[in-house]
Amino acid sequence: MANKRKIYNLADPSLDNYNLLLNEVIFHNANGYIGIRYDFEEGYPEGYEINRSQYINGFYDYTEIKHAERLYGVPDRKQTMLDVADTQEIKLFIDGEEFSMFSGKLLEFDIYLDMDRGVTVREVKWRSPLGKEIALKITRMASLHQLPLFLIEYEIDPLEFRGEIIIESAHDGNVCNFADPDDPRTADRCDQYIIPVSCEIKDGASYITSETSKSGLEVCSCVKNVLSQKNQTEFLLNNNKTTCIMRTKASSERKIKLVKYAVLCDSIRYPDCSLTAREEMNKALSVSVSELHRKHEGCLRTYWKNCYVDIDGDDELAQAVIFNMYQLNQSASKDIYGNIAPKGLSGDGYEGQYFWDSEMFIQPFFTITNPAISKTLIESRHLQLDHARENAKIMGHKCGALYPWRTITGEECSGYYPAGSAQYHINGDIAYSIIAYYLATKDIGFIAKKGAEIIFETARLWMDTGNFYR
């Protein structure tokens, strides 16, 4: 059954742009706090359309909603989940030749997702234009045990090759959100909402701290590169981007391994996100890489123990169900400051906002298999209850609470009334999820403390909205 928890490369071996975009989603790494789309570390040729992005659940800025005419009760701003600093980039040079999937000759190539280990792996055997051969194994993990941590293990096997190896590992604070004016699920403008305010090297690690332009939030990313053998290292700092350049010698008798540690911390959860980033990096470096994987895999074993199902006679369907359960775990916030967006942490779709999908399509799964996550999702709605009360007043109600149709912070983000603010059934969805949680857990203490307050306030809204005849 374990082989059903491994999904191999679904892309055309010709490296078709469309399939590469699909792979960005299928093989993304996430843990409910951070999400990293799957892109080749070395990049792509000119002209390729990609969406190379990293996210933090619930980390947002305010953006304008444009209206032909202003109307009362229709919001004029929304919250948008932001791209944060890019920590993926790794360029490799062998005797001056730059490795690229699009030059030389690919002798072997595969990408797979291992849902037992919680990693994505790319394996490549490559011959350079001048005939040098190397094998690469690149493993990526977003830790379920240490949520701010993203890890890349970049293993180089020189095949019948001796010479100089140069690795350039970058950390880039210059990012902007993906936009498509023709897709209503995404932003219509590619704006830079997050502004780097500091970029520095401390104790061999790079730190980039950025601030949002309007919401007053801050995020710090920290990157540390550790190479398995002696090397000459230098750092370049240029325009809020750091590059760690490592030079070493390669021979066919020994593999070379780079471990790239990256941590992302935001000021919503951590008041001093720069200090926390440093502490999280030190925590990751204090144990072996194998120990980081062991703890991460332990979280997954517990998850699968509670929810694993198999379907006899249809392996493809069984794997599809398993993949969906894996993605639910990657998408669900593990704290009260996030929730679950329709695209999870795999992309910018719907700008990272939360809808009724959370309560009606996703939360029932966690209520049965992992009620602690379901409880956290309810707590996130309780945290926004005052916003819901205010929203009810804006919509003309004397009492009760009206939850927004789409939101990150609790404020309505939909500028289209019929498919936004008018969707009052979001109240019923949230109340339903709380009742379902109680029926499954009998957690009357939590209901008395938080759940009942939401149910009562949404019920008051129904009484104020409806016309009742006795």
Model-derived features with residue positions:
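Acidic/polar, glycine-enriched structural segments that form the non-catalytic walls/loops
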Residues: M1-Y350
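Short, mixed-charge aromatic SLiMs
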Residues: V175-D182, G347-G352, L383-N391, E457-L461
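Helix-terminus loop motifs that line ligand-binding clefts
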Residues: A332-S346, A372-Y432, Y438, G445-K449, ...
